[in-house]
UniProtKB/Swiss-Prot annotation:
It catalyses: (2S,6S)-2,6-diaminopimelate = meso-2,6-diaminopimelate. It comes from Chromohalobacter salexigens (strain ATCC BAA-138 / DSM 3043 / CIP 106854 / NCIMB 13768 / 1H11). Keywords: Amino-acid biosynthesis, Cytoplasm, Isomerase, Lysine biosynthesis. PANTHER family: DIAMINOPIMELATE EPIMERASE (PTHR31689:SF0), DIAMINOPIMELATE EPIMERASE, CHLOROPLASTIC (PTHR31689). The record marks F270 as: Important for dimerization. Catalyzes the stereoinversion of LL-2,6-diaminopimelate (L,L-DAP) to meso-diaminopimelate (meso-DAP), a precursor of L-lysine and an essential component of the bacterial peptidoglycan. The lineage of its organism: Bacteria, Pseudomonadati, Pseudomonadota, Gammaproteobacteria, Oceanospirillales. This is Diaminopimelate epimerase. SUPFAM superfamilies: Diaminopimelate epimerase-like. It is found in: Cytoplasm.
Length: 277
């Protein structure tokens, strides 16, 4: 069979989006890994599936798979691409779209300037929610990594994040520390690792080593987690422009019990078909 797909990106964080409403396919872990291979497949950071909702109050079900084939809870850049895809493919004409994810419901809104605003929900810091092995919630935790002690924030944006503050993100040891923290035993389900440089109270720079994908050009939930941690520590103040290698996201978190709002672009690159056995 031939499977139709769309290649998209949000600030360089790239996705393959597949409509499983108007077509059918069985995509197991090995098949997803093959599709993710940039040499013999299509290549992507994450695969996004558009499915009918199980909850009648929702418009769609939004599923996310990393390049290693594992399903994950949430992806902010992917959410923006999801909204662009369902509008461009006339699966909905709504500007405000409700989707169900493993992490719970998300609200996506297509703004007048065609940027996408995503209600990312309330950041959560309780260790059992992240999950992270710690006796209690705290603004910062000490983490032993490769003989060094790092001051980190542990944040859930529906998926787990560790945030480290660095003086210069360009010189941050992302390639060395990223995989060590991603698989650290204190994060039993693995973790996305953000390296945060505070530029001013309303501006930051960020690099993210994503769980199951490695360093990417942008990570929406990573930007949310970094801003939430930065505001909690008193380093940042809402709203914050976060500069990632692929571009800039605008984040607003006005109060601890408020949803964190993320606004940024979503771009279609090309459409194609691939043969599946």
């Amino acid at each position: 069979m031939l499977l139709h797909f769309t290649k998209m990106h949000g600030l360089g964080n790239d996705f393959v989006v597949i409509d499983l409403i108007t077509q059918r396919a069985r995509l197991d872990t090995e098949r997803i890994r093959q599709l993710a291979d940039r040499h013999v497949g299509i290549g992507f950071d994450q695969l996004l599936l558009v499915e009918p909702p199980r909850d009648p109050e929702m418009d769609f079900r939004y599923r996310i798979f990393n390049a290693d084939g594992n399903e994950v809870e949430n992806c902010g850049n992917g959410a923006r691409c999801f909204a662009r895809f369902v509008r461009d493919n006339r699966l909905t004409h709504k500007r405000e779209i409700r989707v169900e994810t493993q992490a719970g419901p998300l609200t996506l809104r297509v703004e007048d300037d065609e940027r996408i605003r995503v209600d990312m929900g309330v950041p959560r810091f309780a260790p059992e929610v992240v999950p992270f092995d710690a006796p209690a919630d705290a603004p910062a935790h000490c983490l032993e990594v490769d003989g060094e002690t790092w001051d980190i924030g542990a944040v859930s944006m529906g998926n787990p994040h560790a945030v480290l503050r660095v003086d210069d993100v360009a010189q941050a040891p992302v390639a060395r520390l990223g995989p060590l923290i991603e698989r650290h035993p204190r994060f039993p389900r693995g973790v996305n690792v953000g390296f945060l440089q505070v530029v001013s109270r309303h501006e930051a720079r960020l690099r993210v080593f994503e769980r199951g994908s490695g360093e990417t050009l942008a990570c929406g939930t990573g930007a949310c987690a970094a801003v939430a941690h930065g505001i909690r520590r008193g380093w940042l103040e809402s709203p914050v422009d976060v500069h990632l290698p692929g571009g800039t996201l605008t984040l607003a978190w006005p109060a601890p019990d408020a949803s964190l709002m993320m606004t940024g672009p979503a771009t279609s690159v090309f459409e194609g078909r691939i043969a599946l056995p």
